[in-house]
Protein backbone atom coordinates (compact mmCIF):
# COMPACT_ATOMS: atom_id res chain seq x y z
CA UNK A 1 0.00 0.00 0.00
CA UNK A 2 1.40 3.37 -1.03
CA UNK A 3 0.48 6.78 0.37
CA UNK A 4 -0.55 9.40 -2.14
CA UNK A 5 -1.96 12.90 -2.04
CA UNK A 6 -5.52 13.33 -3.28
CA UNK A 7 -7.01 16.64 -4.31
CA UNK A 8 -10.46 17.27 -2.91
CA UNK A 9 -12.68 20.32 -3.28
CA UNK A 10 -13.62 21.97 -0.01
CA UNK A 11 -17.29 22.77 0.57
CA UNK A 12 -16.32 26.19 1.87
CA UNK A 13 -13.45 27.10 -0.44
CA UNK A 14 -12.60 26.92 -4.13
CA UNK A 15 -9.07 25.91 -3.19
CA UNK A 16 -8.51 22.14 -3.49
CA UNK A 17 -7.48 20.44 -0.26
CA UNK A 18 -4.90 17.66 -0.24
CA UNK A 19 -6.16 14.54 1.45
CA UNK A 20 -4.06 11.42 1.93
CA UNK A 21 -5.13 8.34 0.03
CA UNK A 22 -3.88 4.78 0.14
CA UNK A 23 -3.13 3.02 -3.15
CA UNK A 24 -3.29 -0.75 -2.91
CA UNK A 25 -1.79 -2.71 -5.81
CA UNK A 26 -2.44 -6.44 -6.03
CA UNK A 27 0.43 -8.22 -7.75
CA UNK A 28 -0.81 -10.21 -10.71
CA UNK A 29 2.06 -12.68 -10.80
CA UNK A 30 2.31 -13.44 -7.10
CA UNK A 31 -1.31 -13.23 -5.95
CA UNK A 32 -2.55 -16.23 -3.96
CA UNK A 33 -4.91 -17.71 -6.54
CA UNK A 34 -6.12 -20.58 -4.32
CA UNK A 35 -6.94 -18.31 -1.39
CA UNK A 36 -8.73 -15.78 -3.59
CA UNK A 37 -10.81 -18.38 -5.39
CA UNK A 38 -12.10 -19.69 -2.04
CA UNK A 39 -13.84 -16.35 -1.45
CA UNK A 40 -14.74 -15.42 -5.05
CA UNK A 41 -16.20 -18.71 -6.27
CA UNK A 42 -19.63 -18.92 -4.69
CA UNK A 43 -20.10 -15.16 -4.44
CA UNK A 44 -23.09 -14.46 -6.74
CA UNK A 45 -21.70 -11.02 -7.57
CA UNK A 46 -18.77 -12.63 -9.39
CA UNK A 47 -20.34 -15.77 -10.82
CA UNK A 48 -19.54 -14.85 -14.42
CA UNK A 49 -15.81 -14.17 -14.14
CA UNK A 50 -13.28 -16.41 -15.83
CA UNK A 51 -11.09 -18.41 -13.47
CA UNK A 52 -7.78 -17.22 -14.87
CA UNK A 53 -5.15 -15.81 -12.53
CA UNK A 54 -5.39 -12.30 -13.99
CA UNK A 55 -9.19 -12.22 -13.94
CA UNK A 56 -9.22 -13.41 -10.33
CA UNK A 57 -6.88 -10.58 -9.33
CA UNK A 58 -9.04 -8.02 -11.12
CA UNK A 59 -12.18 -9.46 -9.48
CA UNK A 60 -10.44 -9.36 -6.09
CA UNK A 61 -9.74 -5.64 -6.52
CA UNK A 62 -13.32 -4.93 -7.61
CA UNK A 63 -14.58 -7.05 -4.72
CA UNK A 64 -12.74 -4.99 -2.12
CA UNK A 65 -14.07 -1.77 -3.64
CA UNK A 66 -17.61 -3.18 -3.61
CA UNK A 67 -17.33 -4.51 -0.04
CA UNK A 68 -15.91 -1.26 1.32
CA UNK A 69 -18.69 0.70 -0.40
CA UNK A 70 -21.35 -1.63 0.95
CA UNK A 71 -19.99 -1.59 4.51
CA UNK A 72 -19.63 2.17 4.50
CA UNK A 73 -23.17 2.68 3.22
CA UNK A 74 -24.36 0.45 6.07
CA UNK A 75 -22.72 2.77 8.59
CA UNK A 76 -19.57 0.80 9.45
CA UNK A 77 -16.27 2.59 9.97
CA UNK A 78 -14.11 1.51 7.02
CA UNK A 79 -11.84 3.35 4.58
CA UNK A 80 -13.79 5.23 1.93
CA UNK A 81 -13.07 3.67 -1.48
CA UNK A 82 -12.35 6.25 -4.20
CA UNK A 83 -11.69 4.28 -7.38
CA UNK A 84 -10.31 1.05 -8.81
CA UNK A 85 -8.84 -0.07 -12.11
CA UNK A 86 -7.88 -3.67 -12.83
CA UNK A 87 -5.50 -4.53 -9.94
CA UNK A 88 -5.27 -1.05 -8.38
CA UNK A 89 -7.51 0.27 -5.60
CA UNK A 90 -7.46 3.85 -4.30
CA UNK A 91 -9.05 4.48 -0.92
CA UNK A 92 -8.97 6.69 2.13
CA UNK A 93 -5.75 6.51 4.14
CA UNK A 94 -6.53 5.60 7.73
CA UNK A 95 -3.95 7.53 9.69
CA UNK A 96 -2.51 10.95 10.39
CA UNK A 97 0.52 12.79 8.97
CA UNK A 98 1.41 9.83 6.80
CA UNK A 99 1.44 7.38 9.70
CA UNK A 100 -1.19 4.64 9.72
CA UNK A 101 -3.32 4.06 12.79
CA UNK A 102 -2.06 1.11 14.89
CA UNK A 103 -3.57 -2.33 14.64
CA UNK A 104 -5.89 -3.39 17.43
CA UNK A 105 -3.28 -5.95 18.51
CA UNK A 106 -0.96 -3.07 19.35
CA UNK A 107 -3.33 -0.63 21.05
CA UNK A 108 -6.87 -1.00 22.36
CA UNK A 109 -9.05 2.14 22.18
CA UNK A 110 -10.57 1.43 25.60
CA UNK A 111 -10.76 -1.31 28.20
CA UNK A 112 -10.53 -4.91 26.94
CA UNK A 113 -14.21 -5.46 27.76
CA UNK A 114 -15.33 -2.36 25.86
CA UNK A 115 -13.10 -3.12 22.89
CA UNK A 116 -14.27 -6.74 22.76
CA UNK A 117 -17.88 -5.57 22.67
CA UNK A 118 -17.01 -3.08 19.93
CA UNK A 119 -15.28 -5.80 17.88
CA UNK A 120 -18.29 -8.09 18.26
CA UNK A 121 -20.44 -5.14 17.25
CA UNK A 122 -18.48 -4.88 14.01
CA UNK A 123 -19.18 -8.54 13.22
CA UNK A 124 -22.85 -8.08 14.07
CA UNK A 125 -23.32 -4.86 12.09
CA UNK A 126 -21.44 -6.22 9.10
CA UNK A 127 -23.76 -9.24 9.07
CA UNK A 128 -27.06 -7.52 9.86
CA UNK A 129 -26.66 -4.13 8.17
CA UNK A 130 -24.26 -4.75 5.28
CA UNK A 131 -25.26 -8.41 4.78
CA UNK A 132 -21.57 -9.33 4.65
CA UNK A 133 -19.18 -11.62 6.51
CA UNK A 134 -15.57 -10.45 6.74
CA UNK A 135 -14.13 -13.95 6.41
CA UNK A 136 -10.64 -13.24 7.74
CA UNK A 137 -11.21 -11.08 10.80
CA UNK A 138 -8.45 -10.78 13.38
CA UNK A 139 -6.58 -8.28 15.49
CA UNK A 140 -4.44 -7.53 12.42
CA UNK A 141 -7.16 -6.05 10.20
CA UNK A 142 -8.89 -3.88 12.77
CA UNK A 143 -7.22 -0.54 13.41
CA UNK A 144 -7.48 1.68 16.48
CA UNK A 145 -8.42 5.17 15.35
CA UNK A 146 -9.07 8.31 17.41
CA UNK A 147 -12.80 7.54 17.50
CA UNK A 148 -12.62 3.77 17.91
CA UNK A 149 -12.15 0.66 15.81
CA UNK A 150 -11.74 0.76 12.02
CA UNK A 151 -12.29 -2.31 9.85
CA UNK A 152 -9.89 -2.84 6.93
CA UNK A 153 -8.88 -5.51 4.38
CA UNK A 154 -12.30 -6.25 2.96
CA UNK A 155 -11.44 -8.03 -0.29
CA UNK A 156 -12.30 -11.49 1.00
CA UNK A 157 -15.64 -10.46 2.58
CA UNK A 158 -18.58 -12.44 1.19
CA UNK A 159 -22.32 -11.95 0.95
CA UNK A 160 -24.61 -14.15 3.01
CA UNK A 161 -25.42 -16.17 -0.13
CA UNK A 162 -21.88 -17.54 -0.31
CA UNK A 163 -21.94 -21.28 0.51
CA UNK A 164 -19.29 -20.85 3.20
CA UNK A 165 -20.51 -17.53 4.64
CA UNK A 166 -21.60 -19.03 7.96
CA UNK A 167 -18.39 -21.04 8.34
CA UNK A 168 -16.49 -17.81 7.82
CA UNK A 169 -18.74 -16.01 10.32
CA UNK A 170 -18.07 -18.56 13.04
CA UNK A 171 -14.34 -18.38 12.30
CA UNK A 172 -14.41 -14.57 12.63
CA UNK A 173 -16.10 -14.92 16.03
CA UNK A 174 -13.57 -17.55 17.13
CA UNK A 175 -10.64 -15.36 16.03
CA UNK A 176 -11.86 -12.35 17.99
CA UNK A 177 -12.51 -14.54 21.04
CA UNK A 178 -9.01 -15.99 20.78
CA UNK A 179 -7.46 -12.52 20.88
CA UNK A 180 -9.52 -11.29 23.83
CA UNK A 181 -9.90 -14.42 25.97
CA UNK A 182 -6.72 -13.69 27.95
CA UNK A 183 -7.68 -10.04 28.40
CA UNK A 184 -11.32 -10.30 29.49
CA UNK A 185 -14.27 -12.67 29.60
CA UNK A 186 -15.68 -13.54 26.18
CA UNK A 187 -19.00 -14.94 25.00
CA UNK A 188 -19.43 -18.56 24.07
CA UNK A 189 -18.81 -18.57 20.29
CA UNK A 190 -21.82 -20.79 19.55
CA UNK A 191 -24.15 -18.58 21.57
CA UNK A 192 -22.71 -15.45 19.96
CA UNK A 193 -23.15 -16.96 16.50
CA UNK A 194 -26.76 -17.77 17.32
CA UNK A 195 -27.41 -14.26 18.62
CA UNK A 196 -25.91 -12.60 15.53
CA UNK A 197 -27.73 -14.67 12.90
CA UNK A 198 -31.01 -14.80 14.83
CA UNK A 199 -33.24 -17.68 15.81
CA UNK A 200 -34.95 -17.69 12.42
CA UNK A 201 -31.74 -19.02 10.88
CA UNK A 202 -32.13 -22.25 12.83
CA UNK A 203 -35.77 -22.58 11.82
CA UNK A 204 -35.00 -22.78 8.11
Which role fits each region the language model picked out?
Residues 51-78, 101-135, 140, 145, ...:
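Conserved kinase catalytic-core helix
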Residues 94-102, 156, 180-181:
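Active-site catalytic-loop/activation-segment of kinase and kinase-like phosphoryl-transfer enzymes
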Residues 83-84, 138-139, 192:
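Proline- and acidic/polar-enriched loop/turn elements at helix boundaries
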Residues 1-100:
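Conserved ATP-binding subdomain of kinase catalytic cores across diverse folds
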Residues 111-115, 119, 127-134, 145-204:
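C-lobe/activation-segment region of protein kinase-like
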Residues 27, 95, 139, 144, ...:
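Short, glycine/acidic-enriched loop or turn micro-motifs at the edges of active sites
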Residues 35, 101-106, 161-163:
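Short acidic, glycine/proline-rich loop/turn micro-motifs
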Residues 87-88, 141, 148:
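Structural motif
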Amino acid sequence: VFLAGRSEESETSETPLMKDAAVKIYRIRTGNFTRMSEYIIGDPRFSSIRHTHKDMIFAWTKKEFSNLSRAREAGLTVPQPYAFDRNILVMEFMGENGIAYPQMRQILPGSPEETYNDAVGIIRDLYRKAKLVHGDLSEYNILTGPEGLILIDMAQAVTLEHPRAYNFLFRDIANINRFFEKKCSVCDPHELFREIVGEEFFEL
